[in-house]
Amino acid sequence: EELLQKLKLPYHVVVNCGGDLGLGQVKKYDIEAWMPSEKRYRETHSSSYFHDFQTRRLNIRYRDNGTLKFVHSLNNTALATPRILCQIVENYQQEDGSILIPEALRAYMGKDVIRTLS
């Protein structure tokens, strides 16, 4: 969320229902940012909790007061890079075709605006 807040992109957090969970997932959160061309939100980040589903198959355990227990695991997509680039372009594109660079990225881009070629 912090990344999307710094980029000032419209977003929301979705708690997925049981029918949308994949094999072994116990709980899943998605962060979706607005795509103006599609008039809908699209996933940019995902975080899933698997309890011990994956670690049982991998035999990843820890010892708790002498008792072996399986660890619990998470699976996360830190950022869907191609999609977030599209969302930045779409949300920051101006009527003349230029693209404002989000403030948080200006130091890395070395400019404030990407202009169209004339």
Model-derived segments and spans:
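TRNA-recognition modules of translation machinery and tRNA-sensing kinases, especially anticodon-binding
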Residues: 1-118
